[in-house]
Structure formats: C-alpha cells, structure tokens
C-alpha cells in the first residue's frame, strides 16, 4: 500500500506542477494581451475556477487575434494590379491605399510635389489625409457628420460615396423577393456571402434561381461561414457545384478549430457589381415567417445602387481569397465595373449629391474595433436623439458610460431589444444594465411581436447605420461584421418611422418592472455578466 502511494505521488505531484505552470502561463498571456480589464479578469476567473475546462476554452476562444492576424489577403501579380484601387481593408502598406480616390490624390500629389516618390509611407499618408480632410470639408457636410466620415476614412480607408438609389426592407418576404428578382435579372456575376444559409424553402428557391442563372453563363461565387452553414446537406452543395457555382467556407472549423469562435457574420449579395443587398437577414425561412420558434421575424435589409458597391466588392473579394477561393475576378469584373470604380473622382459639392454613404467593417484581426468606434462616435455627437435597435445588448463599460453621459446631457435615448429571445444568456445579461441606464433617463423597450433582429442606430434624424453589427461585444470584438452608414435625412427618417411603428408592439422596461425582478434572477443575471466580456 505504501509503495502504491509512492507511485501515485510520483505521478501526481509533477502533474500538479505542470497543471499550475500551464495556468500561470495562460494568466500571464491574458495579462499581456491587448484586451479590456474586464475581459482579462473574466478569463483569469474562468481558468482559475475551472482549470482544465477554462484552459481549453481559452485556447479555443480566448486568444486575441487582433495582433495575430487570422487572415491576410492572398493577392499577387495581376490580381493585385487589378484590385489595388479597391482594397484598403485591414492593412496599411502604402501600395494598397492607392485605390480609387486615394490613387487620384497620390497622382495629384506627384504633380504638385516632385519629391512625392521619395517620401516615406507616413509622409505620403499624412499628405493624402490632409487632402481628404479638405475634400470632406469642401463638400459642406455638418461638423457632426464630418467627424464620423473622417474617423472611418482614417481607421479603414473607406470613402464617402454618392449613391443613386436605395430601398429599405423591414420584412424577409419583400427583401428576398427583391434579391430573387435581381438574381433573375443578373447578366454577368452574382457574389453572395452569408453567415447562415439553410436548405429550407427559401434556400431551395435561391438555389434553383442560382442554378438557372449559372446555366445561362452567369459566374456565381457563394461564401458561407464555416459554422453558420455546417448543417447544409451534401446533396444541396453538390447540386450547386454541378451547375458550375463556386463555393467556399470562411474559417472552416474542419481546418481552423482554434478559430471557431471567430465567425463571418456578414450578409452581402452583389449582383453584376451594380447592386448590393445587405443588412441583418440570412438565408433561412425563419427570416420570412419566423419559423417554428417565433410568431414573426422583424429585420432590416437594404438594396443600394451606386458608388458604395466598390467597397462591398472589396470586402467580398478579400473574404473570398482568404477562404481559399481561386483568383478569377479579373475575367468576372474586368471592364466597365472596375473601370468606373478606378475613374471615380472625389465628391464635389457642385455635383448633385443623392445619398451619401460609407461602409464600416471590422473583425477580430483588424487594427481598430471600428464598428464599436462608430457606435460610440454616433452617440457622442448626438444633440437631440439616439434610437438603438439590436436583438442583443451587451455593451462594455465605455459604451454604457457614453450612453449615460449623452442622456445626462439632455439627449433622448431609446433602446429597443427583442422581448422574445432566441438565446437566453444575452437576454439575461442585458437586464443587468437596465437599472443604471434608466436612472440616467434612458428608455428601454422590449419588442414583443416576434423576434427582433434589426441592428440600427438613428441619430438626430441626420445620421444612421444599419447592417450586421449587434450592440454587443461579440459583434465589436469577435465577429467579422459590416454596416452601411447613411449621411441622409431621408434614409434616417425612413428608419425612424419604422422604429416608431415597432414601438407600438413593445413593452417598456421601467423602474416598476425593475422592482419585480426577483433576487434569484438578479443573481443569475449578474453571474452571467461576469463572463460576458468573453462570450
């Protein structure tokens, strides 16, 4: 018996030492990571409370990829030459910032300053940014809008674009009828990128429409998220491929298990590089009728024609190439579409300005959490009113403080979240913020007529944004997201009108309702809030 104890201790003691060493190494890694103090504390709490499970969770979901690039554009030769004027997303080398209007300004800079070719990258960027700032000022935008335009340009390189038309959709039937109509009218290319794509009734309709166009010679590329479409049947995929349709998976979990937490949440449909559909809607029948779980589904999508197409095209091509897709865009878009994008000149206040827009996108490996900055800046610049719609509401302390400061400054703020959740945990965590927000004068509403999936913010009826980004830390820090930003009173009023209609089927969460939340529920919600920074 004594010998057995010696043998066990011989194995157990070294194992314990290794175990504690791993925990210490992970704790140091967390402390040295570029993340918020709350996230650091949450991860350290998790690995010390649940050593084995916590360590596995951290290795799978906790590594901060903002400094360790998950993806990088794989372009060379003719690929880079053709798209050099489309790309400026997620990188800062000077060869890639000279696209479209940046390229225009660089050429003008060379004409003005003969030493431009000898300037350093930082000097060139500074010169170009100065010219861009002057252009934005000369357009005559109000300071409130101008600040956001400049921030997005400096953070992402996305330009202000002048667009011809838009149409907002507040229900899935109308949105997908429009997408299917545009697919039916496609002549050259169809590019679609979605987080969820099901083989249900809607999925079959879109599949059949795509196969029909592929047989007509239209070149089609489909980009699916590796997790959001993992249930897609082999037969469904085989039918698409047999028709000549190219399919790729973004961070397929079969090959990127350590990155399975980082998902492509974008929803983009590009038709002939002239039309883009984007917003909150995935390809699934529930987005039309609510499915089996919900009475109905409230969401927002938009159809746009105009200059903004170039920015969505750049995002799609980037994601496609980084998902192992072969480069074949030269034949697809060479000619009129790319030529028009290359020839774009800076917006001039003398020209007719229709619908001014910008794209904002970010992901776990982008230099800045730009979408979080966008939401924060919109709240900070508000003078009168902020309207927020999001199914999930899990902000960090910075955004909570921003909201409270705006409310205490006299800005009227209404926040609308879903009252019929699809996920319990974010719903519970959201409740933990209500007391301090209500105390600051912010109104909280829960949408009760089905599931609310819209992600919209409207400020002062002048600036608005909608897209894929929820008001939560997963969207800000972990997922790949994309939003359209509108500097248009017409579009902002359109979104506000729908917000007010949605209010009619909401219940207000006020102080009286707060008092009815039991101690048990408050404790449960607060426990889950502890780990919210790592969700």
Features from the language model and the residues they span:
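Helical hairpin unit composed of two closely spaced alpha helices linked by a short loop
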Residues: 392-413, 418, 423
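N-terminal localization/anchoring segments of enzymes in phospholipid and broader phosphate metabolism
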Residues: 1-372, 377, 381, 421, ...
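Exposed, interaction-prone extracellular/peripheral surfaces
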Residues: 374-378, 401-404, 408-409, 429
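Hydrophobic alpha-helix-in-membranes signature
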Residues: 50-53, 390, 394
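C-terminal structural cap/anchor segments
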Residues: 411-415, 419-471
């Amino acid at each position: 018996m004594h010998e057995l104890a010696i043998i066990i201790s011989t194995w157990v003691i070294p194992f314990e030492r290794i175990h504690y060493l791993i925990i210490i190494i992970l704790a140091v890694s967390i402390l040295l990571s570029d993340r918020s103090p709350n996230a650091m504390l949450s991860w350290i709490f998790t690995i010390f409370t649940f050593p084995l499970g916590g360590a596995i969770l951290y290795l799978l979901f906790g590594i901060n990829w903002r400094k360790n690039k998950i993806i990088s554009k794989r372009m060379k030769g003719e690929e880079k030459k053709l798209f050099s004027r489309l790309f400026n997303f997620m990188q800062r080398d000077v060869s890639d910032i000279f696209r479209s209007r940046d390229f225009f300004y660089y050429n003008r800079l060379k004409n003005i300053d003969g030493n431009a070719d000898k300037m350093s990258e930082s000097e060139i960027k500074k010169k170009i940014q100065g010219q861009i700032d002057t252009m934005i000022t000369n357009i005559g935008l109000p300071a409130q809008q101008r600040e956001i335009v400049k921030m997005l340009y400096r953070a992402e390189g996305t330009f202000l674009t002048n667009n011809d038309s838009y149409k907002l959709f507040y229900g899935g039937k109308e949105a997908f009828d429009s997408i299917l109509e545009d697919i039916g009218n496609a002549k050259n290319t169809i590019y679609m990128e979605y987080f969820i794509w099901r083989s249900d009734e809607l999925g079959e309709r879109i599949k059949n429409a795509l196969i029909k166009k592929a047989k007509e010679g239209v070149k089609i590329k489909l980009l699916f998220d590796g997790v959001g479409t993992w249930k897609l049947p082999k037969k469904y995929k085989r039918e698409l491929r047999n028709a000549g349709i190219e399919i790729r998976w973004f961070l397929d979990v079969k090959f990127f298990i350590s990155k399975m937490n980082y998902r492509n949440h974008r929803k983009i449909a590009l038709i002939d590089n002239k039309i883009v559909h984007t917003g909150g809607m995935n390809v699934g029948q529930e987005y039309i009728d609510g499915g089996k779980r919900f009475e109905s589904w409230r969401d927002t999508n938009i159809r746009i024609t105009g200059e903004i197409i170039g920015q969505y095209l750049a995002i799609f091509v980037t994601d496609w190439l980084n998902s192992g897709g072969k480069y074949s865009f030269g034949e697809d878009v060479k000619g009129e579409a790319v030529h028009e994008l290359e020839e774009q000149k800076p917006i001039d206040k003398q020209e007719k300005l229709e619908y001014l827009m910008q794209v904002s996108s970010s992901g776990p490996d982008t230099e800045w959490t730009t979408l979080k900055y966008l939401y924060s800046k919109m709240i900070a610049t508000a003078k009168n009113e902020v309207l927020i719609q999001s199914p999930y509401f899990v902000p960090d302390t910075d955004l909570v403080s921003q909201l409270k400061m705006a409310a205490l400054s006299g800005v009227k703020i209404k926040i609308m979240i879903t009252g019929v959740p699809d996920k319990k945990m974010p719903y519970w965590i959201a409740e933990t913020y209500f007391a301090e927000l209500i105390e600051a004068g912010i109104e909280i509403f829960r949408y009760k007529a089905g599931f609310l999936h819209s992600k919209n913010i409207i400020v002062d009826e002048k600036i608005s944004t909608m897209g894929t980004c929820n008001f939560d830390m997963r969207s800000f820090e972990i997922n790949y997201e994309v939003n359209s930003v509108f500097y248009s009173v017409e579009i902002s009023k359109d979104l506000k009108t729908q917000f007010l209609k949605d209010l009619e089927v909401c219940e207000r969460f006020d102080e009286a309702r707060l008092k009815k939340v039991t101690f048990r529920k408050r404790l449960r919600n607060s426990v889950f809030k502890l780990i919210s920074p790592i969700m």
